[in-house]
């Protein structure tokens, strides 16, 4: 199920810029294994969901998965073949702003071999370079 905020204060946001490294959400909090971002990017709610599904499918019933990022930034897109001007486009999809060091997914309750494979499948769905890390 794609996630997006139930309600926001404003419909549209500035694009902003991704400077520096992530100081929040860069430590393992819930599970034992995690996937950590190494590059700055926007990760869409579809990509987050694809990674979550891949991990869940590989791990089957065993283990628990935590998604540590949430898409809370609306991205606007203008209709195709529209002339310049006449305001900003309408919100099309949601993204999560990810900086280097940010934990994307965590996993626990499975062996390291299973976790490594499940997380590598999820990593292949991400648009950036990532690394597998172990708590400790």
From Swiss-Prot:
Transmembrane residue ranges: none
Pfam families documented for this protein: Ribosomal_L16
PROSITE patterns: RIBOSOMAL_L16_1, RIBOSOMAL_L16_2
Listed GO biological process terms: mitochondrial translation
CDD domains, sorted: Ribosomal_L16_L10e
Protein origin, superkingdom: Eukaryota
Coiled coil (residue ranges): none
Keyword Acyltransferase: no
Localization of this protein: Plastid, Chloroplast
Keywords: Chloroplast, Plastid, Ribonucleoprotein, Ribosomal protein
GO cellular component: chloroplast; mitochondrial large ribosomal subunit
Predominant place of localization: plastid
GO molecular function: rRNA binding; structural constituent of ribosome
InterPro entries associated with the record: Ribosomal_uL16, Ribosomal_uL16_bact-type, Ribosomal_uL16_CS, Ribosomal_uL16_dom, Ribosomal_uL16_sf
PANTHER family: 50S/60S RIBOSOMAL PROTEIN L16, LARGE RIBOSOMAL SUBUNIT PROTEIN UL16M
NCBIfam families noted in UniProt: rplP_bact
Family membership noted in the UniProt record: Belongs to the universal ribosomal protein uL16 family.
Cited HAMAP family: Ribosomal_uL16 (MF_01342)
Record's subunit section: Part of the 50S ribosomal subunit.
Protein name as catalogued: Large ribosomal subunit protein uL16c
Species of the source: Buxus microphylla
Lineage: Eukaryota, Viridiplantae, Streptophyta, Embryophyta, Tracheophyta
Gene: rpl16
């Amino acid at each position: 199920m794609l996630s997006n905020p139930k309600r926001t204060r404003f419909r549209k946001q500035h694009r902003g810029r991704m400077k520096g490294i992530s100081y929040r959400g860069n430590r393992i909090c819930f599970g034992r294994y995690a996937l950590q971002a190494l590059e700055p990017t926007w990760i869409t709610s579809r990509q987050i969901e694809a990674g979550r599904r891949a991990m869940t499918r590989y791990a089957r019933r065993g283990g628990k998965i935590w998604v540590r990022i949430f898409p809370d930034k609306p991205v606007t897109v203008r209709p195709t073949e529209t002339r310049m001007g006449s305001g900003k486009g309408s919100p099309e999809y949601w993204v999560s702003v990810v900086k280097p060091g940010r934990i994307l997914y965590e996993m626990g309750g499975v062996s390291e071999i299973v976790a490594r494979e499940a997380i590598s499948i999820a990593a292949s769905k991400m648009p950036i370079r990532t690394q597998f890390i172990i708590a400790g």
